[in-house]
């Protein structure tokens, strides 16, 4: 009896092979032939799962996004104080270990490539800015955001902070390490929030 292959699982394996090729050779080396070889498939077999190279690259890009989103969803349901929850979510969006640094390197390579292929994937609609707006709204709903804060501008500042930290953490992970990233994000969040009495009670029961 022929071995049945999980179609979606194989597509994800091919996407992960695409990441490895990009990390080793850059986007210019992410040809269908190189990806097929990395995935241990013939070119014809690769075409069975993805009819075009852009279809494969779009899927591989979205898979990176889904991995981060899944980790954020896991944090969102945890029983944490609001500022701590926001901090943990933001830390998931900045590379702080070998795995997430690789993901970020692939993501930046994809977004640079996708700038000229809006029909493939519009990086300006990657959900990150809307995520920042949701976090600012969450702080506001928790009565923590400073009263006169401009929520739209604060979302933009948070986006710029996370994006900049992500780039610098990828380029210089020794200097921009997890501890420094956490301190920068914590100080920024504290600067836009009022004191949380629940945190005070937790420190001084």
UniProtKB/Swiss-Prot annotation:
According to the entry, DNA is bound by residues in 31-50
Q: Which GO terms describe its molecular function?
A: DNA-binding transcription factor activity; transcription cis-regulatory region binding
Q: Domain of life of the organism in this record? A: Bacteria
List GO BP terms, alphabetically.
Answer: regulation of DNA-templated transcription
Keyword Transcription assigned to the entry: answer is yes
Q: Which UniProt keywords apply?
A: DNA-binding, Repressor, Transcription, Transcription regulation
> Could you confirm whether the keyword Transcription appears in this record?
yes
One Pfam match: TetR_N
InterPro entries per the UniProt record, alphabetical:
BetI_C, DNA-bd_HTH_TetR-type_CS, Homeodomain-like_sf, HTH-type_TetR-like_transc_reg, HTH_TetR, Tet_transcr_reg_TetR-rel_C_sf
Give all residue intervals belonging to the HTH tetR-type domain: 8-68
Could you tell me what this protein does? Transcriptional regulation of the polyketide synthase operon.
PANTHER family, alphabetized: HTH-TYPE TRANSCRIPTIONAL REGULATOR PKSA, HTH-TYPE TRANSCRIPTIONAL REGULATOR RUTR
What is this protein's name? HTH-type transcriptional regulator PksA
Gene name per UniProt: pksA
